[in-house]
A protein has these predicted regions:
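Low-complexity, intrinsically disordered or signal/transmembrane-proximal segments
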Residues: 12-15, 26-27, 38, 52
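Short, Lys/Arg-enriched N-terminal segments with co-localized hydrophobic residues
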Residues: 38-57
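N-terminal, intrinsically disordered charge-dense segments
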Residues: 8-10
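Domain-level signal for soluble alpha/beta catalytic cores
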Residues: 53-369
């Protein structure tokens, strides 16, 4: 269950885990803390005979990696670019250097599934909007470079090519971060129109790292969009579905093993129409996944309104929130997981309290059959 740490024996590791659980007492109820410590004690008794087997089975994934740089390199380079002190090539090189450093840090740490496309020059929602061709006409008409059009959407533009304000910003769920609100017009044609996701995958592959591309999922993207004309969200479902299908087809062409769809909107209150919309999108999208495995990643809470639907669908992995997701453990204990996707035994289910600490993604390979 645990990776072997050089120079640390079993007893030291178990003792450290107990102390760690106690230090994080404020995040857990007495009952859950007790279950964590009981799990650690059970592990002590079984670690010896299962050590090699569990080490092979243990895999780790991160949702994404901070992009700004340890010395805020991205911030300073971006500000210089906005002041016309450096050219686009220098900004792009800084970004490339940061991505390399971040990927290598994760590789050296032994992370199994390292994310790509989690880097952004400004905002990941804006990145996804550009990926899907959701670019309002007023920005296209500026006839700027792709990079400057992107920044015009994020910051506004006043110059020889025109004068436009930035897109609106809204709070990103329950955080202090604000995202750029995508804006779909009546004549917007959603389609796969940018290559950033695949470019960064290829960039990491040149370093010997096969990454897990990350992109905001279709349901969350539709919920975050602002529709400025006569059309409503449902009018864009067909094109949006086709765009994500095309994305998965391209992933297969490039032999990408895993792709992560971030769906934090699933933790919000969902009525029957919302659940139906989620099915309508992903029942179609997942038909095109082929050999590419799809992880649906949630965060900022639990998915109580869609949990049973989620586990019954053809996802290959589900990322659940065991910190802010107050109902997550109860949902798993009450409803279990899909037999086809997650073959959990009772012993594995009892150990799920540790998922809250380690934040592991539960997939087929993590569970005893």
């Amino acid at each position: 269950m645990f990776k072997k740490i050089s120079g640390v024996n079993k007893e030291q590791a178990v003792h450290s885990l107990k102390l760690w659980a106690i230090c994080f007492f404020q995040y857990f109820s007495n009952r859950k803390l007790s279950r964590i410590i009981q799990f650690v004690e059970r592990t002590t008794n079984t670690l010896d005979e299962k050590e090699q087997e569990e080490e092979k089975a243990m895999q780790t994934s991160v949702i994404g990696f901070p992009r700004i740089g340890t010395l805020r390199e991205l911030k300073f380079a971006s500000e210089k670019y906005f002041r016309n002190e450096i050219k686009a090539e220098e900004l792009l090189q800084t970004a490339k250097d940061l991505r390399k450093a971040h990927w290598m840090t994760q590789k050296e740490a032994g992370i199994t599934f390292i994310s790509s496309n989690d880097f952004s020059h400004y905002d990941l929602v804006l990145d996804t909007a550009v990926l899907l061709g959701i670019v309002p006409k007023r920005y296209q008409e500026l006839q700027l470079s792709a990079l400057d059009t992107y920044f015009a959407m994020a910051r506004g533009y006043q110059g020889t090519s025109g004068d436009v304000k930035a897109l609106a910003m809204k709070k990103w769920f329950n955080t202090n971060y604000h995202y750029i609100v995508p804006e779909a017009e009546d004549d917007t044609v959603i389609h796969l129109s940018a290559s950033k996701l695949f470019d960064e995958y290829a960039e990491a592959k040149e370093l010997g790292i096969a990454t897990k591309p990350v992109v905001i999922g279709a349901y969350t993207m539709l919920k975050l969009c602002r529709f400025t004309g006569e059309k409503k969200a449902e009018d864009f479902i067909g094109d949006l579905t086709a765009a994500y299908q095309e994305l998965l087809k391209e992933c297969q062409k490039q032999q990408i093993a895993w792709v992560q769809f971030d769906e934090p909107a699933l933790v919000r209150d969902m009525d029957a129409q919302d659940v139906e919309l989620f099915h309508r999108l992903y029942d179609a999208v997942l038909q095109e996944k082929g050999n590419c495995r799809v992880l649906v990643q949630t965060y900022f809470g639990d998915v109580r309104d869609v949990y049973q639907d989620l586990t019954a669908m053809d996802f290959d992995g589900i990322g659940l929130d065991f910190l802010e997701g107050k109902e997550t453990v109860r949902l798993i204990e009450a409803y279990g997981l899909s037999r086809t996707a997650f073959r959990l035994t009772k012993s594995c289910l009892r150990d799920l309290s540790m998922e809250r600490i380690f934040g592991r993604i539960i997939t087929r390979k993590h569970c005893r059959r």
